Amino acid sequence: MFPMVTGFMNYGQQTVRAARYIGQSLMITLSHANRLPVTIQYPYEKVITSERFRGRIHFEFDKCIACEVCVRVCPIDLPVVDWKLETNIRKKRLLNYSIDFGICIFCGNCVEYCPTNCLSMTEEYELSAYDRHELNYNQIALGRLPMSVIGDYTIRTITNSTQTEIATGKRFDSKTITNY
């Protein structure tokens, strides 16, 4: 008789424990129910990147002196710099400059150490391609300025909470994530 009573007691304790766990998880779920979603509808809404965002590299051909500092500071020796020495003026003439963004780790060392500031990071992060060879950008493709997300009227931009806080001077909680 006692084993049967202890079995019922154990069953009752396990039932109470299971009900408590279900109640706790239900409370957590219900506490998240009144919040706004934090996901964005990607092609139609885009997040404005921060000032220090490291996107695609922009290259200005006219400023480059072919010093190859960018190649030396790159952890994977990625930029390909082709140049020719002009003997009459004793200077290097840049022939070709290319970066393969399929291999680039976007560390920003090339931009930081460039003595003539011919390299800069843009806010462009959409570098998808069907063929990996399309990610090898030459000086013409690197020289194109990306279209700004802010200027595109077809896309609704969503600012970060820190950017909105700085602009408006008031603090937002997790329920207010958009600027409309």
Swiss-Prot record:
Keywords: 4Fe-4S, Chloroplast, Iron, Iron-sulfur, Membrane, Metal-binding, NAD, NADP, Plastid, Plastoquinone, Quinone, Repeat, Thylakoid, Translocase. Its EC number is 7.1.1.-. It comes from the Eukaryota. The keyword Zinc does not apply. It is found in: Plastid, Chloroplast thylakoid membrane. GO terms for molecular function: 4 iron, 4 sulfur cluster binding; iron ion binding; NADH dehydrogenase (ubiquinone) activity; quinone binding. [4Fe-4S] cluster 2 binds at residues 74, 104, 107, 110. Residues 55-84, 95-124 form the 4Fe-4S ferredoxin-type domain. It is a peripheral membrane protein. It catalyses: a plastoquinone + NADH + (n+1) H(+)(in) = a plastoquinol + NAD(+) + n H(+)(out); a plastoquinone + NADPH + (n+1) H(+)(in) = a plastoquinol + NADP(+) + n H(+)(out). This is NAD(P)H-quinone oxidoreductase subunit I, chloroplastic. It comes from Ranunculus macranthus (Large buttercup).
